[in-house]
Regions:
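Active-site core of glycosidic bond-cleaving carbohydrate-active enzymes
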Residues: 1-179
Length: 179
């Protein structure tokens, strides 16, 4: 528990200073500033942001969802496109709902344009694909899908959010397990 608190504190102070939209990176900073769905969703879902930064991160997360974003090929995708990548997908809906943005989370879930969870369903899928570009109307199966499963968990992680937030099935931390 002490190690967790030490690491969490170090991340907050080392990587997440006070919010300032005009702050430029320091010469000693390493890495890149990221303005992506995953860069906000993951730390929000894990509770990494402090009380000062969390509302700003949430505002930026909502912005990354409600605006058009360019994909890896530079093609502009419409608002409410799922642009989290493999790792951020499991965190985005929970990050939104945990911070009172249920309508944004539902909007993201119910979008049918590419790339989204329901795009594959609208195109005949009966399971969750490993890659959002497994099949597209524009490219058929000709996209970057050499390593691909048409029944995969990663993008299906939204199901946990659906159980807890759509169906209301919540765990009771005081009484875990089935009774």
């Amino acid at each position: 528990k002490t190690t967790f608190k030490t690491i969490k504190s170090g991340v907050k102070t080392g990587f997440m200073g006070p919010p300032n939209a005009n702050a430029a990176p320091e010469a000693s900073d390493k890495g890149q500033l990221m303005d992506t769905q995953a860069s906000y969703a993951i730390p929000l879902a894990l509770g990494t942001f402090n009380a000062t930064n969390a509302p700003h991160a949430l505002t930026h997360l909502v912005s990354t969802i409600t605006r058009s974003n360019a994909d890896d090929q530079g093609i502009a995708r419409p608002p409410y496109s799922l642009m989290t990548g493999f790792i951020g997908t499991a965190s985005i809906s929970e990050a939104l709902s945990a911070n009172g943005k249920h309508a944004i989370a539902y909007g993201l879930l119910t979008t049918k344009t590419y790339p989204s969870w329901l795009y594959s369903v609208a195109n005949g899928a009966t399971s969750i694909w490993e890659r959002l570009n497994s099949y597209t109307i524009e490219n058929g199966f000709g996209g970057n899908n050499s390593m691909n499963s048409f029944n995969h968990y990663s993008f299906g992680a939204v199901a946990a959010w659906m159980y807890t937030h759509s169906l209301g099935i919540q765990r009771d931390p005081e009484s875990p397990g089935y009774q």
